[in-house]
Regions:
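Core dinuclear metal-dependent hydrolase active-site scaffold
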Residues: 1-44
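Cap/insert and terminal regions of metallo-dependent hydrolase folds
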Residues: 39-129
């Protein structure tokens, strides 16, 4: 297990790269809005996908989310858009499956997130239980 720094507004947030003797490698990232690292040889990805910028902005415009929440979300949680960029930046050739974690109750859409991640990755995508 190898910890690595991730971006978040809390102190010392970490992601983890885990490998086993069979050559499987899992990257686990949650409570982060960005990962500066790229990984090769991953077989499994478990990554936060908390909100969509579009959905968040629609909820702010409709009064369902206070506008003051937007800057904090942008600096503390992975958006769908950043997750897609993260996946594009990584070697996906050995990835067997992707698990999306920590979806927002109000600012996410499970079906949309699953479809978009599958389109970008070409891999099976699962939504973690809430």
């Amino acid at each position: 297990i190898m910890p690595f720094d991730v971006e978040h507004d809390a102190e010392q947030p970490l992601g983890f790269l885990m490998a086993n003797r069979d050559g499987e490698k899992l990257v686990f990232i949650t409570d982060s809005y960005y990962c500066r690292y790229t990984f090769s040889g991953l077989t499994h990805i478990a990554v936060e996908c908390n909100y969509s910028l579009r959905i968040l902005d629609e909820n702010i415009a409709a009064g369902r989310v206070h506008p003051a929440m937007r800057p904090r979300l942008l600096r503390s949680h992975f958006s769908l858009e950043n997750v897609l960029d993260f996946l594009r930046a990584n070697d996906m050739s050995k990835v067997q499956e992707i698990h999306l974690l920590h979806l927002s109750d109000n600012n996410s859409d499970e079906a949309l997130f699953k479809r978009k991640v599958q389109e970008v990755s070409g891999k099976p995508v699962y939504i973690a239980g809430r």
